[in-house]
């Protein structure tokens, strides 16, 4: 099996961190999103929506979407329990995964794709043309900054995002912070709990994927 990715993009980063934490080795194939390689026919045969990452199994089947890929490997190798162990933990981790995606990642994506010249006529991750809407960029920035305050409040009362144990929610938040910096949404002195949490996570093995 192999994973097609663009190493520095946020969704591939989530899978990289997850697999590093699980100590799972997989072959990676780089797809140059900047040059538009993901919109060429060869890659569209793998993922018609053009997004990365995409996991191609040995039988030829393809799993796209970063969280779906992580779920696949989690089913193969459950430990360490990054999606929670007990029913309660699983529910809480899933809740925070969704919150981070909806309240954090999505607004940053809206901001970037509706403001960057690189995404002109490509405001959504799809090979078909979609015009940018500048107002969505402004709203995305506002919502992402609001989320910094919300997650800082959460971390002021909890060691990790989902509670006492490191989980996929922490991976998602760590990637969110890197992605948010692309549009200048960065924690300030008002987000001390978030800043301290990030310092702790940066020492973990999975965070080292950002060094390559």
PLM features per residue range, with description:
Residues 1-131:
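GST-like domain detector, emphasizing the conserved glutathione-binding G-site
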Residues 27, 163, 188, 209-210:
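A local structural micro-motif
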Residues 45, 203, 212:
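Phosphate-coordinating loops and pocket residues in cytosolic domains that bind phosphorylated ligands
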Residues 74, 78, 156, 202-203:
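Residues at helix-coil transition
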Residues 102-200:
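GST-like fold's C-terminal all-alpha helical module
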